[in-house]
Amino acid sequence: MKNTLIDDIASLARDMGEVRLMEVCGGHTNTVMRYGLRDVLPKNIRLISGPGCPVCVTSQRDIDSMVELALSGVPVATYGDMINVPGTKMSLVDAQNLGADVRMVYSIDQIIDEKDRVFFAVGFETTTPMTAKLLSAGIKVFCAHKVMPPAMRALTQEMRLDGFIDPGHVSAIIGSDVWGRMDIPLPQVISGFKPDQLLHAIFILLQLIQNKEVRVVNDYSEIVFPNGNTIAQRMIKETMKPVDADWRGMGTIPLSGLAPIDPLLDARLIYADLFKDIVSVENPACRCGEIVRGLVEPKQCPLFGTVCTPEHPQGACMVSDSEGACAIAYKYGKSLAE
C-alpha cells in the first residue's frame, strides 16, 4: 500500500467530522479485512461492510423452500456455499445426508443437460447471465438473484451514510451509467479490488464529500464501461423479469430481484403448493441480518467464534469465507491473533 495515498487520505480527513463509507461487495470486504485497511484509515473515517454477500442476503424462506423441495424427491443443484447455509430445520447439505439429491456445482455446464433438476440460482448481477443461459436451455430455476442498486437506495433511507464504494464486478455487467440513474443521494466511486484501488476510491469519496458533490466516479474504467456488458444484459432481459425480493435483514425491496419470464421454468410457481405451508424462523441469537446492513460488526454477535464458526455456521454470514463478513472476520481475525 502506498504511504503517500494513506497520507493524502489523512490530510483530507483532518478537517472532516465522522465520515461513514459503505462497501457493498463481498470482494471489497475481503480486501478490507485481509489487508487491515480499517487500521490505516484515520479514526473519523468509518468503513462499513454492507450487503455484498449474495449467500448472506438470501432469505431464510428461500433456503427452507429448497430444502423442502430436495426432501420431496426433486433433484436440486446450487453453487458451493449455498448448500451449507442453515435453514430453519436444516441446510441443503443436511438434506443431502438424509438421501436427497443435492448437487454442488462450480459451473452451470455441469447441469445444463439435466432437465429434471432445479437450479437454486443465487447471486448478484455478476452471476445472473449464467442463470440466463440455463433458462435458455430449458432448465427449471428457483431464482433468488438480487439486484444491487435498489438495495443501496433502501440503505440510504435507513441509516446515515456519506458515500458508497460501488461493486466492481456488478458494475462491469450493468455499466457505470446505471448508478447515476438510480436516485441514490450520495457520492459513489466504482472501485477495483486491490488495496491501493480501494484506498484511492476512499480518497476520491472524501474529495467528493468535502466538495459536496453527489455524483458517480468510475475509478475502475479498465474493466467497467458506461454501458456495461450489453451481451450479458440482453441474455438477462430475454429470460428474466424484475420482481420484488426478500433480503435477509432488509425485508422486501421493490424490484430488487429477478424471476424467469417463462412460468414453466419458474420453480417457485411450479412447486408453489409444496412451499405454501413453510414456516421460516431465524435463529434469534444470530445477528447476520444486522451485519449485512452494516448496523453491527461480526464480533458483536454473541455467537461469533464460539458456537458459530466456518466449520459449524449458525448463520449465513459465517458460510462464505470469500464474501461473508463473519467468515472473513473469523478467517483473518484468527490469523492475526496467532
Enumerate the language-model features and the residues they cover.
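Metallocofactor- and cofactor-centric catalytic cores in central/energy metabolism, strongly enriched
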Residues: 1-114, 128, 136, 142, ...
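Short amphipathic alpha-helical segments
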Residues: 34-35, 131-133, 177-178, 203
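Short, surface-exposed basic-aromatic patches at helix termini and helix-loop junctions that form
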Residues: 38-42, 134-140, 156-158, 179-185
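Short, hinge-like loop/turn segments at secondary-structure boundaries
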Residues: 66-67, 94-96, 157-161, 207-208
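Short, well-ordered secondary-structure micro-motifs
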Residues: 89, 152-154, 176-177, 201
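Active-site histidine-anchored catalytic micro-motif
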Residues: 114-121, 126-167, 173
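A conserved active-site cap/scaffold subdomain adjacent to cofactor or substrate pockets
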Residues: 142, 159-225
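Internal helical hairpin/lid segments
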Residues: 200-290
